[in-house]
Curated annotation (Swiss-Prot):
It comes from the Eukaryota. It comes from Dictyostelium discoideum. This is UPF0746 protein DDB_G0280787. One of its GO terms (molecular function) is DNA binding. Residues 1-19 have a biased composition (Basic and acidic residues).
């Protein structure tokens, strides 16, 4: 049997690239194993595991794993091959048809065109004069150093970059079209990250995916990434990342028929994948169903489950609610579902399910009468919350767009009732389809009762508490919703406040719920409600003394002042509760909790009564502390400042916190207007540095703006690096540098207001700063210079002080992958490699190897192509060191590790290049090629 199979397989290598292979033919055509023959043999049990392995190897596929896994790989290969052949045949036919049409069309006569310029701005003429003057051009553009940040290869398609760069799609498009040697997309992981990121269903995204598929397909590129080589894997990835747009365009671009998709679904997609239902999963499910590409095993039911709060969120737009309803109803035939349950009796029908089904069926009939075109665009794009806040129980007026749907005079339906029906239908859908034991997980959200049940607030509270039966009842959501609902009468809100303070709800309240209620009152920012609440509280403090620890209204106002969101509330407290509140006391510290947007108005109120705010160091500070400190420094008439010696240490944490929050200008403003009495220690750089997000770059530019390479050289010279007497502290040596501030580095509004006279406030000297000192480790010094595009300065320091910078305790850490990997472009990495080649010694050989590892892991194929093209470099860099070849630098294991790094990062084009060039043994070559197969 194996020998016969062997004959079939031996013909595969010579035939599996032919375009005329017919996967639907029976048997073996001219000795060629077809998909139909392969599947027939497997299904009949005549193909054993060993034969499957032989077939997989012959097709260039991995042969490891269980029998079913090997079979899936082979079937995936045949499916991709079928799609690829169809695509090639279609393109060939289209080209022939186009050629025939061109031959039939008369050739147009040649015309001469004259290029003229109209309405050219005068300044443009000057631009072209400068642009065409080579001397001026070179002088101007010599100041632009974009080698580091302009290089595509520095970017890569990792998720951090894609998420943090607003124009990442445009950059990828530009890179694909440029077709240069430095490609952003280097491996399948990058493609997967793109599929995970770009999901918007618009023309721009569709066009992007068509460009992507065109660039990376077998008909247009020699890249190792070819979508049509792994049709099954990419369909799996797109469904896994829930990307409808990519999947839709992928199927259309490669003209994948429904039978292929069904087979892929059976092989790779678990039948329950759509069970954990989401809005976007339903879209894919219904799409596959509409193109007849869902196998019978992949029905939405009986696996369905969901987080109902997301479907019914009142923050969703109205049009999303409508689509959610339609997708759920379209996804399954409920009547058929009920009949199946009755006949098969596999799932016992709960009596209430039949009742739910009848109700749902009635609502569906009613909603079918409503067309989406009846709603205005404003309504469809408004959130449910906003629509409900503008609807009324009546439907007699059409003057306000949000009150009623667009309709005839005889069909003026209330929008609130329509929304309620959509909500109710979605709830009923899940009640009909889930087991009664799990019904509690599909309970209507609290906001449903608050918006759609017409009863008093008091009765509403009793209803929802009983409905939740004490389990996870959200008092905060209830109180805030009631107090902020503009459709609820003020008297009912006053009654709620009275009932809470009179302990009417004490049986259902926990102690903490009272604090939640207080917070809800203050967060309403409704002056009438707050005033009513405070007056009752002043009249009966003893009644709630045991319930709350804050019966004093002054403390309550202070503790919840962070919730104030408008000037009118501040004015209300100032005019009515100034004496009771601590908010306007002299030397108070409560001001630190007031929102920054209101702080200027608060300063005005304090200044008007001649009182000052106190700012001293406390162990606690929020993310806006440095901004508040900057205000305090600039307004000495409103603030009194005093810090002890601990602030120097705490300030390092403040700098770290503000960098992580992208508030580097706050740090710069502070250092421009206050002098620390000790050098700023930048040890936090070690943990905060994040090259992907571009954080710290503004701050680093500020620090090193006026620090020359010569001044750095002077500081480095004083470090004692004698090997015979260095100790631990010397190994960890730091250098102290001085940043000189000039008009160009401190041109901020804050500096214009900076106090002219210096003032000592403990560990700080307040006043405009001319310079300040900071300490930094040598390793982070190199990282900062690298980020500032000052690699030329690093190489200058290499030449001047090799005994310092090439000390293993500093430089080896700098060249380690975790430190330099994320910031290394191929341009600068190649500069380092070439420098080390020209200055070889025991240390630089290690650094050279580290840089080669980074280049391999990042997929910098061009660096290795340049090395290979140089006979001299390639002989001792990419050839194995042996007894007969001592000129080579690296042994077989080290070179093997370089290749493995490229394989592990899915840079297979580079992997194959290195495997073919390096003189590995046949055994090692085969081993590395198998690693590639297993990684695909």
């Amino acid at each position: 049997m194996i020998s016969n199979k062997r004959k079939e397989i031996d013909t595969i290598d010579g035939h599996h690239e032919k375009d005329n292979d017919d996967d639907d033919s029976d048997g073996i055509d001219n000795g060629l194993l077809t998909y139909k023959k392969f599947k027939k043999d497997f299904d009949s049990g005549s193909t054993n595991y060993r034969e499957l392995q032989i077939i997989a190897k012959s097709l260039g596929l991995a042969s490891n794993g269980k029998k079913q896994l090997v079979y899936n790989r082979i079937e995936g290969y045949f499916l991709s091959k079928k799609v690829k052949n169809n695509l090639t045949n279609n393109e060939t036919n289209q080209q022939e048809e186009k050629k025939e049409e061109e031959q039939q069309q008369p050739q147009p006569q040649e015309k001469q065109y004259i290029l003229t310029f109209k309405d050219v701005e005068p300044v443009e003429n000057y631009f072209w004069k400068v642009f065409r003057n080579i001397v001026i051009f070179k002088h101007i553009f010599s100041n632009f150093k974009n080698k580091q940040y302009g290089y595509y290869d520095l970017i890569g398609c990792d998720r951090s970059y894609l998420n943090d760069t607003s124009n990442s799609m445009e950059i990828i498009i530009d890179n694909i079209k440029s077709n240069n040697n430095h490609q952003i997309i280097r491996n399948k992981i990058n493609i997967a990250n793109i599929i995970h990121k770009f999901k918007k269903n618009d023309e721009k995204t569709k066009s992007f995916y068509n460009l992507l598929f065109s660039r990376y397909s077998s008909t247009s590129t020699s890249s190792t990434i070819q979508f049509d080589e792994n049709i099954d894997k990419w369909i799996q990835a797109m469904i896994g990342h829930v990307n409808f747009t990519a999947l839709d365009q992928f199927i259309k671009f490669f003209k994948i028929d429904s039978e292929v998709i069904k087979k892929v679904m059976k092989i790779h997609i678990d039948p329950s994948v759509f069970g954990n239902t989401t809005y976007d999963k339903l879209k894919i499910y219904n799409y596959l169903k509409s193109i007849n590409s869902l196998p019978t095993s992949h029905t939405l039911l009986p696996f369905i489950s969901t987080d109902l709060s997301k479907f019914l969120s009142f923050d969703n737009k109205f049009k999303k609610l409508i689509k959610s309803y339609k997708r759920l109803i379209e996804s399954t035939n409920l009547q058929e579902r009920m009949e199946q349950q009755k006949q098969k009796e596999k799932i016992k029908i709960h009596p209430s399910n039949i009742k739910y089904y009848e109700k749902l069926n009635q609502i569906i009939l009613e909603l079918n009468e409503i067309q989406t075109s009846q709603f205005t665009n404003d309504q469809l794009n408004s959130t449910i919350k906003n629509l409900l806040n503008h609807t009324t129980p009546t439907s007699t007026s059409t003057s306000t767009p949000n009150l009623t749907i667009t309709s005839t005079a005889s069909n003026n339906i209330n929008l609130k009732e329509i929304i309620k029906k959509y909500y109710k239908s979605i709830c009923l859908f899940f009640y009909c389809t889930v087991n009664s034991a799990t019904e509690m997980f599909f309970r209507k959200p609290l906001l449903y009762y608050l918006n759609f049940k017409k009863e008093s607030v008091d009765k509403m509270y009793e209803r929802v508490v009983n409905k939740w039966n004490g389990r996870s009842f959200d008092h905060q959501l209830f109180f805030q919703s009631i107090l902020k609902d503009i459709n609820i009468e003020k008297n009912e809100k006053f009654e709620l406040i009275s009932n809470v303070l009179d302990n009417k709800y004490v049986k259902t309240f926990k102690e903490y719920d009272h604090y939640i209620f207080f917070k809800a009152v203050f967060s309403s920012n409704d002056i009438e409600l707050i005033d009513y609440f405070l007056k009752i509280l002043m009249q009966q403090p003893n009644k709630i003394q045991k319930i709350t620890r804050y019966p004093n209204i002054g403390k309550l106002i202070g503790n919840y002042c962070n919730l104030i969101d408008k000037k009118e509330i501040l004015d209300f407290y100032f005019q009515n509760y100034r004496d009771e509140s601590l908010l306007f006391d002299d030397q108070n510290e409560i001001w630190k909790q007031i929102q920054l947007e209101l702080i200027e108005h608060y300063e005005y109120l304090m200044d008007s009564i001649g009182k000052r705010c106190k700012l001293d160091f406390t162990p606690w500070f929020d993310q806006n502390f440095l901004d508040r400190l900057n205000r305090a420094i600039l307004k000495p008439s409103v603030y009194s400042i005093g810090f002890d010696g601990y602030f120097d240490i705490v300030f390092e944490g403040l700098v770290d916190l503000n960098i992580k929050d992208n508030k580097e200008n706050s740090i710069i403003n502070f250092l421009s207007n206050a002098q620390l009495k000790h050098p700023l220690d930048l040890k936090f750089f070690e943990s905060s540095f994040n090259p992907y997000k571009g954080k710290m770059l503004t701050f680093i530019k500020f620090l090193f703006n006026n620090i020359s390479k010569e001044s750095i050289e002077t500081k480095l010279k004083v470090i004692n690096l004698k090997t015979d007497n260095k100790n631990f502290e010397e190994i960890k040596s730091k250098i102290e540098l001085t940043t000189t501030l000039t008009a160009t580095t401190t041109t901020t509004t804050a500096n214009l207001l900076s106090p002219k006279k210096s003032k000592d406030v403990g560990c700080l000297t307040i006043g405009k700063t001319e310079s300040f000192n900071f300490t930094i480790s040598i390793r982070m010094l190199l990282v900062c210079l690298y980020n500032l595009d000052r690699v030329d300065d690093i190489i200058y320091l290499f030449d001047k002080l090799p005994e310092v910078l090439f000390n293993p305790d500093y430089f080896s850490i700098f060249t380690n992958e975790y430190c330099i990997y994320g910031i290394s472009s191929s341009y600068y990495l190649e500069l380092f490699i070439n420098y080390f080649i020209e200055n070889l010694n025991n240390n630089t050989i290690n650094y050279l190897y580290n840089c080669l590892c980074i280049a391999s892991k990042k997929g910098y194929t061009q660096i290795f192509k340049n090395i290979i093209s140089s006979d001299q470099n390639s002989k001792y860099l990419l050839k194995i060191q042996t007894k007969s070849n001592q000129s080579s630098l690296f042994d077989s294991k080290l070179l093997n590790d370089i290749v493995v790094k490229s394989i592990n990062s899915s840079n297979f084009e580079l992997s194959n290049l290195l495997i073919d060039f390096i003189d590995f043994s046949a055994k090692d070559k085969n081993s590395l090629k198998m690693k590639i197969l297993k990684s695909k």
